[in-house]
């Protein structure tokens, strides 16, 4: 299974917001950090907002932020909003197949079991887990300046 670019950047946007703490994150800043167009991020933002995964604040000093702790937002929460279909084979799509084995096929059952296992793994990881796995994330995203070692004056 391959996740879409939309899902990839939705997760990245949420990671950026989580790394930025309670401060508002602006779409141009997020776009610059990831080297992607603002328009693409705005497109992704809409379903995330409708699902309650992102909160938007309008106005001159507006932006986006997480509406709840990053530890409460799972990867599954994001994937179920951003992916259109989880059909791993045509027999997953109702009315799309003429196969006489569709109701008793072992492949269908095996793929359904694999898909459920995939969802279970995604439910075990949060946005917070991804952020904490990268100790330098704030520096990498341009949210902080690198800490430079102080040299003593001789």
UniProtKB/Swiss-Prot annotation:
HTH rrf2-type domain location is 2-132
Q: Which PANTHER family match?
A: HTH-TYPE TRANSCRIPTIONAL REPRESSOR NSRR, WINGED HELIX-TURN-HELIX TRANSCRIPTIONAL REGULATOR, RRF2 FAMILY
Q: State the name under which the record lists this protein.
A: Protein aau3
Which metal ions or organic cofactors does this protein require, according to UniProt? [2Fe-2S] cluster
Positions of disulphide bridges: none
Positions that bind [2Fe-2S] cluster: 91, 99, 105
Job description of the protein: Required for growth utilizing PHB cycle intermediates.
In terms of PROSITE patterns, this protein maps to: HTH_RRF2_1, HTH_RRF2_2
One GO cellular component term of this record is: cytosol
* Keywords (A to Z) from UniProt: 2Fe-2S, DNA-binding, Iron, Iron-sulfur, Metal-binding
Q: How is the cofactor bound?
A: Binds 1 [2Fe-2S] cluster.
Q: Name one GO molecular function term.
A: DNA-binding transcription factor activity
The lineage is: Bacteria, Pseudomonadati, Pseudomonadota, Alphaproteobacteria, Hyphomicrobiales
């Amino acid at each position: 299974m391959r996740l879409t670019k939309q899902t990839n950047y939705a997760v990245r946007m949420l990671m950026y917001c989580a790394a930025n703490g309670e401060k508002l994150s602006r779409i141009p800043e997020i776009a610059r950090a990831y080297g992607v167009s603002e328009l693409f991020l705005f497109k992704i933002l809409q379903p995330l907002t409708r699902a309650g995964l992102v909160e938007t604040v309008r106005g001159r000093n507006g932006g986006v932020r997480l509406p709840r702790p990053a530890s409460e937002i799972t990867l599954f929460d994001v994937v179920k909003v951003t992916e259109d279909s989880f059909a791993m084979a045509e027999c997953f799509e109702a009315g799309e197949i003429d196969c006489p084995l569709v109701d008793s096929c072992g492949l269908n059952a095996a793929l359904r079991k694999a898909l459920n296992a995939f969802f279970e793994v995604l439910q075990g990881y949060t946005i917070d887990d991804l952020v904490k796995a990268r100790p330098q994330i704030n520096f990498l995203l341009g949210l902080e300046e690198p800490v430079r070692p102080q040299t003593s004056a001789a």
